[in-house]
UniProtKB/Swiss-Prot annotation:
This is Putative K(+) efflux antiporter KefB. PROSITE patterns: RCK_C, RCK_N. The keyword Zinc does not apply. It is a multi-pass membrane protein. One of its GO terms (biological process) is potassium ion transport. One of its GO terms (cellular component) is plasma membrane. Residues 571-656 form the RCK C-terminal domain. Its main location: membrane. Pfam families: Na_H_Exchanger, TrkA_C, TrkA_N. Residues 410-527 form the RCK N-terminal domain. Keywords: Antiport, Cell membrane, Ion transport, Membrane, Potassium, Potassium transport, Transmembrane, Transmembrane helix, Transport.
């Protein structure tokens, strides 16, 4: 039953996606599997409600575009250059050998050579979408095996271009035409890369400096979308995939100080559209054929996983990489790829494959995707079990993984807010050779600091993705030096969610929000004005010849007591606009007729009003912390500490104004 109306279809699709994802998350099953199942249930091959596939597939393509853009942000040209031999050598060998092995195996089983070649090409692809999304979620995208897996899968996406050109002309016996077509595709890829890199490096940084200086989040997001889609359009106009252009644009942006904020801006679009992409893949499957072809498809999926795990492990191991890392890379790349679906569609359209064969291959690839999600998620446990059990514990690599630690993001300090205070902290950390990363949203400040090779990024610390990207899970300490209380609280709450045990020091302007910040999870709160007062007091005492040891002792006592003495202040008329809940000092004179005269402090029970008696002044003598049995006399002055509201109430009682009213 085809649902009528685009809006109705979209609402039904989104509602079903929300329901299935919630259901699968309760069972701790990846959301991508839920999306695939949604596609199967809402596709044209089932008896239930049917969503039109036309516009779904068009929308879904942008999911891959934004994903490749995000991947590009995390892969600088320097990283690609360092891995050039590994990527080109391993990538070519993996794609070529997988295609050849599968084709030879199927040909030996009686499958036509052309069909065997197509199936081999399909099986050679790996899903960059699943691999990168899963590794990003697990925080393994910058590990040694993660970078190898993503790099090789992106290379496979590039090799899909010649396959897309070759498959439609397999029936043509003119090798010269095929060679010229492939040569033209390579030329276009080089041209697109040159255009995006040259234009991007000279224009994008200046463009984003202007945009970020406007302090408009909407303008920043619009600019990110413009850059991503413009690069995608460029490569599409040259006959290449949109995803390839987005990847190039991402790599250019990844070399700027804006990359963390760019990734945060693109993420909502990426996640939603990727979900729709997986739905579109599920729509291709005909579940009615499963009883007939299920066993063949399952065998194909297992064959695909086995061949790729063994082959990739052997190839990576041959480059000198540790066995455990090689096996983990093999597990990651075992998954079938979405570009394989494009090859299937071309082969089906050109008559190379019949409908039944395409359904078998499609089902095999989908099954491999479902299984590979779990292989990727548990790649560490599986590699240590298999390598340690079958080959021996000595073969398991003991070297640290090439992840956050080897990028300077291990036991580091994250400074949220790189203004005057944040930079002061950074300078002392630099002197002590403590690694740190600064985050700030002042584009000019970030630009100047980066010119001096200071590790600061234009990024919003209130975005949890930013905190994840700077390795908060591996950090030693978080310093929040925002002047804006809202930004400080938001950053603090996200940090506590991501890393409950991380020590967090928060700077605040004064003592008025200390309690709120502590309640939100701050380990220490440093009121700027109070610390300045303590420093001034220290100099005063030293100039009065008070021993330095005694001065340090007094300062430390105040810090241990959470600045209790310095928080006890008398408020003036300029403080009337302060919140009534802010604690302060107030002196109350017990004049003639006060009901407090001739009563002991214990009988008076000032604590019931939520206030504290700090001292009593009698005949110009100051008595600090008087005993509870002391009896009050006329003309005594009580120095009280508490909120303005509580002090006012106590003052009315002590001066008998309530009785007078």
């Amino acid at each position: 039953m085809l649902l009528d109306g685009t809006l109705i279809q979209l609402l039904f699709l989104l509602g079903f996606m929300v329901f299935m994802v919630m259901l699968f998350q309760r069972a701790h099953i990846p959301a991508s599997i839920a999306y695939l199942l949604v596609g199967v249930l809402l596709g044209a091959h089932t008896a239930g409600p049917v969503i039109s596939e036309g516009y779904i597939h068009k929308i879904a393509e942008f999911g891959i575009v934004f994903l490749l853009f995000t991947i590009g942000l995390r892969f600088s040209w320097q990283q690609i250059y360092q891995l050039r031999h590994t990527i080109l050598g391993l990538g070519t060998a993996q794609v070529g050998l997988t295609t050849l092995l599968v084709a030879l195996l199927l040909w030996a089983m009686g499958v036509a050579s052309v069909v065997a070649f197509v199936i081999g090409a399909v099986f050679a692809q790996s899903s960059t979408t699943i691999i990168s999304k899963q590794l990003l979620e697990q925080g393994e995208d910058q590990s040694r095996h993660g970078r190898l897996g993503i790099s090789l899968s992106v290379f496979q996406d590039i090799t899909a271009v010649p396959f897309i050109i070759v498959i439609p002309v397999l029936g043509v016996a003119m090798a010269q035409d095929i060679a010229s077509t492939l040569g033209m595709a390579l030329f276009k890829a080089v041209l697109a890369t040159a255009l995006v890199v040259l234009v991007g490096r000279y224009l994008l940084r200046h463009l984003f400096h202007r945009v970020s200086s406007s302090d408009s989040a909407e303008l920043f997001t619009l600019t990110v979308l413009l850059v991503c889609l413009a690069a995608a359009w460029l490569t599409q106009s040259l006959g290449l995939s949109m995803a390839f252009g987005a990847f190039l644009a991402g790599m250019v942006m990844g070399e700027t100080e804006f990359k963390l904020q760019v990734e945060a801006a693109i993420r909502p679009f990426r996640d939603v559209l990727l979900g729709i992409f997986f739905v579109s893949i599920g729509m291709l499957l005909d579940p009615m054929l499963l009883p007939e072809i299920g066993h063949i498809a399952l065998a194909g999926a297992l064959l695909l996983l086995l061949i790729k795990i063994v082959l990739v492990t052997a190839l990576v191991l041959a480059t000198g990489v540790a066995l455990e890392t090689a096996f983990r890379t093999g597990l990651i790349l075992a998954v079938g790829g979405e570009f394989g679906f494009a090859l299937l569609a071309l082969a089906l359209e050109g008559g190379t494959l019949d409908s039944r064969s395409s359904q078998i291959i499609l089902t095999s690839v989908l099954l491999s995707m479902m299984l590979a999600v779990f292989l990727i998620r548990y790649n560490l446990q599986l590699s240590r079990f298999v390598v340690g059990r079958w080959i021996g514990q000595a073969a398991v690599s003991s070297e640290p993984f090439d992840d956050i630690e080897q990028h300077g993001l291990q036991q580091h300090v994250v400074i949220a807010g790189f203004g005057r205070i944040g930079q002061g902290v950074a300078q002392f950390l630099q002197k002590e050779q403590v690694p740190y990363i600064g985050l700030d949203l002042d584009a000019a400040r970030v630009k100047n600091a980066r010119l001096a090779d200071v590790p600061v990024f234009y990024a919003d610390s209130t975005d949890p993705d930013t905190l994840i990207a700077v390795g908060l899970a591996k950090a030693r300490l978080l310093v929040i030096s925002h002047e804006d209380l809202s930004a400080a609280l938001t950053t603090l709450r996200h940090a506590r969610t991501l890393h409950p045990d991380l020590p967090v020091i928060v700077r605040t302007r004064d003592e008025s929000h200390v309690a709120e910040l502590r309640q939100a999870g701050a380990t220490e709160v440093i009121p700027e004005t109070i610390e300045a007062g303590m420093m001034l007091t220290s100099h005063v005492l030293l100039m009065l010849n008070v021993p330095a040891r005694r001065v340090n002792q007094l300062v430390q006592e105040q810090r241990i007591n959470r600045y209790q003495l310095l928080r006890q202040q008398f408020r003036g008329s300029a403080d009337l606009l302060k919140t009534q809940q802010q604690e302060q000092l107030k002196a109350v004179l017990l004049a003639e007729g006060s009901p407090a005269i001739d009563q002991s402090l214990q009988m008076l029970d000032l604590a019931q009003y939520g206030i504290q008696l700090t001292e009593l002044v009698r005949a110009h003598n100051r008595i600090e912390q008087p005993s509870l049995d002391m009896v009050l006399q006329e003309n005594d002055v009580l120095v009280l500490f508490g909120s303005a509201e509580a002090l006012e109430q106590a003052s009315l009682v002590l001066t008998h104004r309530l009785a007078a009213d």
